[in-house]
Amino acid sequence: MKIALAADHRGHAAKERIAILLSEQGHEVLDMGTNSAKSCDYPDLAYPAAKAVADSKADFAVLICGSGIGMDICANKVDGVRAALCHDELTAQMSRRHNNANVLCLASDVLGEELMRRIVSSWLTTDFEPGGRHERRVRKMAWIEQGRDPALYDVDDGLAKDDRDADSR
């Protein structure tokens, strides 16, 4: 798989170690910076990596900053991105299995190197469970990206519930 990888200055060292892990696992790594521990702004790094996923230039992205929160918020501003801030293997697996997350965010100030490695490996080897409630919920997330209230729309037919009700009268 092609994995976009980015970090700010606080996540730089972890990014370098994760890049090695990904390469060892046979993934193509798109290193999108930063390339030093010099202070930088995480939105400048999160956006291009998330956009690479949204534009299908990367299959997934892994973003790292001190808390993981800034990267997560920025990535989730990009249409088509479902970024998940994960702190353990269970949240990594659930974000993929139930939410079809395509961007993994990590907190370098919180997680140790071995745990980060396990989270990344677990996240990349867990597949989405298509169909049923999880797929419906992911479609509802896409409605939100379009500025629509998912409670007002039938995601199976794309019609507003009021419109569907009017058609049945």
Predicted regions and their residues:
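C-terminal binding/interaction regions
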Residues: K2-G11, E89-R169
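Helix-adjacent hinge/juxtasegments
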Residues: P48-L85
